[in-house]
Amino acid sequence: MAKIGRALISVSEKTGVVEFSRALAGYGVEILSTGGTAKLLREAGIAVKDVSEFTGFPEMLDGRVKTLHPKVHGGILGMRENPAHVAKMQEHGIEPIDMVVVNLYPFEATVAKEDCTMEDAIENIDIGGPTMLRSAAKNNRDVTVVVDHADYAVVLDEMKNSGGSVSRETNFRLAVKVYQHTAAYDGAISNWLGARTGEGVAPFPDTLTMQYKLAQGMRYGENPHQSGAFYVEKGSRESSISTARQIQGKELSYNNIGDTDAALECVKQFTEPACVIVKHANPCGVALGANIMEAYDKAYKTDPESAFGGIIAFNRELDESTARAIVERQFVEVIIAPKVTEAASEIVAAKKNVRLMECGFWPENPAPRFDYKRVNGGMLVQDADLELFTELKVVTKRAPTDKEMEDLLFTWRVAKFVKSNAIVYGRDNSTVGVGAGQMSRVNSARIAAIKAEHAGIPVQGAVMASDAFFPFRDGLDNAASVGVTAVIQPGGSMRDAEVIAAADEHGIAMVFTSMRHFRH
């Protein structure tokens, strides 16, 4: 085990550093420090030696050069069990540094500010910090390196139990954490600077660097013969499947996570109380109601057969009555809501395998983000599809009634989350039938009608949403044959005139959005 005799402490994020330093001093550890950290520790009554005194060389260039010195890096990198290293250290008066406690300038927080300039960004690129961290991590057999204040307690507990030493096993784990941290730090700098050109900000950097943290292992992946795991974005704060808290139930599976993400992101679109039921990443029942009990009841009745073993998402607090209705009515894999009442949690607890999730509430307007799709040997990157339409243009002789327009906008939101080719029939803010994932758009329309008939729900008087344009009039003819009265679609087909004429023939009102919502 490595006995700690001297520690260099220099941190931007100062949470817990005073208490940690005081505890180190209690073990007789000499503390070296710089700048604001040294000032803070002295004000707390802790003895500190400035790094400039330790090296015999002053800080210079407005603080850009503080720790870049052989006495610092020799003291960190010198191998204690290597006689040649020890001899050279003695020859040059280099004293060992046994612990490095450093975190880095807040580059990501700086560039996240709207008024951040290039100068601000450059000045928040840490040089000495990463260099010390990497040096200490390289020599982890002899040096303890701490980059995360969450590890202060771990280190102190080990020192308490070992008389002031830290094990090589702990040092190795902390060193790995350092390289993960510096990789993410350099990646953030690379991504931000790489998007800056002489002509402004490019939408995508030349090189994209990302880091995800292992959140959980899994019994298997999408299928039992595949291994799987779940990684989450570092520092993610948005209400999502990645930040949700599991209250009870079995461990989330690979498919559970994908389906719950689809359900939650769909239900987030609605401001009224809403319920979304998803099966295999497709909404099979979506509805709005005066409350979530009504919304759930309507959504379930759309397609009770497909709802079996599905994922249920709400945009309101899950209450006792709704929880009871779910567990008494159907088998469900996951229930997710922004908040769960204690009474609702107790009801669901009767079904111990049901995964109950609480994700927190979300802002009305989501922050822009990227979507990623892995392909063999590469990755597709795009803006997330957060917009709804470019315009609402009535293109037929008959305009939709106010009630039809309300249902059109409802089904349009649902269609965004149905796999293409997507057709959604809806009425009274509830899905009537969903046709998903067909290679032919007219077949998706036929399937939506079949689903409605199977559930005993008449399509007559319903509206229809299509995620992309109709290439031929057959989609409109099919809609008319089952009683659809209004249609919403992007438009943009070379046969738009033919499709509009078909709608007029059938007395169907049609609205173009000028925005497609393919989903693959």
UniProtKB/Swiss-Prot annotation:
EC assignment: 2.1.2.3, 3.5.4.10
Catalytic activity, reaction form: (6R)-10-formyltetrahydrofolate + 5-amino-1-(5-phospho-beta-D-ribosyl)imidazole-4-carboxamide = 5-formamido-1-(5-phospho-D-ribosyl)imidazole-4-carboxamide + (6S)-5,6,7,8-tetrahydrofolate; IMP + H2O = 5-formamido-1-(5-phospho-D-ribosyl)imidazole-4-carboxamide
Keyword annotations: Hydrolase, Multifunctional enzyme, Purine biosynthesis, Transferase
Keyword Transferase: yes
Keyword Transferase: yes
Cellular-component GO terms for this entry: cytosol
One protein family per Pfam: AICARFT_IMPCHas
Domain named MGS-like: residues: 1-147
MF terms (GO), sorted A to Z: IMP cyclohydrolase activity; phosphoribosylaminoimidazolecarboxamide formyltransferase activity
PANTHER family assigned: BIFUNCTIONAL PURINE BIOSYNTHESIS PROTEIN ATIC, BIFUNCTIONAL PURINE BIOSYNTHESIS PROTEIN PURH
HAMAP family listed in its UniProt record: PurH
Domain notes: The IMP cyclohydrolase activity resides in the N-terminal region.
Family listed: Belongs to the PurH family.
Name of the protein in its database record: Bifunctional purine biosynthesis protein PurH
Upper classification of the organism: Bacteria, Pseudomonadati, Thermodesulfobacteriota, Desulfuromonadia, Geobacterales
